[in-house]
């Protein structure tokens, strides 16, 4: 937990090494989650990238009420669901135009 606190603090201070460490620590696990919602590795990569952008922009909102991994996982799942909804709308629009 202390390591997580230091990691979060470093990321919030803009420390690139800490940001890379956070990404490297969780990216492979989160990619697996993204793959469950995506139709391809490319889509999963897009979801992962978008999710980590949200993680880094909202990191100051993390309240230590649960694990950092759980918080990141929730962001990834929500990002993936939003991606699927957006893709479904594009698919429906494409069908309507044919």
Describe the predicted segments one by one:
Residues 1-29:
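N-terminal module of bacterial RNA polymerase sigma factors
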Residues 8-9, 20, 31, 35, ...:
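Solvent-exposed, non-membrane alpha-helical residues enriched in polar/charged side chains
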Residues 12-13, 52-67, 86-88:
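Sigma70-family region 2
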Residues 17-21, 42, 46, 70:
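Short, solvent-exposed positions on alpha-helices
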Residues 23-41, 58:
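Amphipathic, Lys/Arg- and hydrophobic-enriched alpha-helical face
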Residues 32, 46-53, 57, 66-78:
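Structural recognition of an alpha-helix C-terminal capping motif at a helix-to-coil junction
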Residues 60-63, 74-94:
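Arg/Lys-rich amphipathic alpha helix in sigma70-family domain 2
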């Amino acid at each position: 937990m202390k390591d997580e606190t230091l990691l979060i603090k470093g990321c919030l201070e803009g420390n690139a090494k800490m940001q890379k460490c956070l990404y490297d620590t969780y990216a492979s696990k989160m990619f697996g989650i993204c793959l469950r919602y995506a139709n391809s590795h490319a889509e999963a990569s897009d979801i992962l990238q978008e999710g980590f952008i949200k993680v880094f922009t909202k990191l100051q909102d993390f309240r230590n009420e649960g694990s950092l991994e759980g918080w990141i996982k929730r962001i990834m799942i929500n990002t993936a669901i939003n991606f699927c909804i957006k893709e479904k709308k594009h698919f429906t629009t494409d069908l309507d135009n044919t």
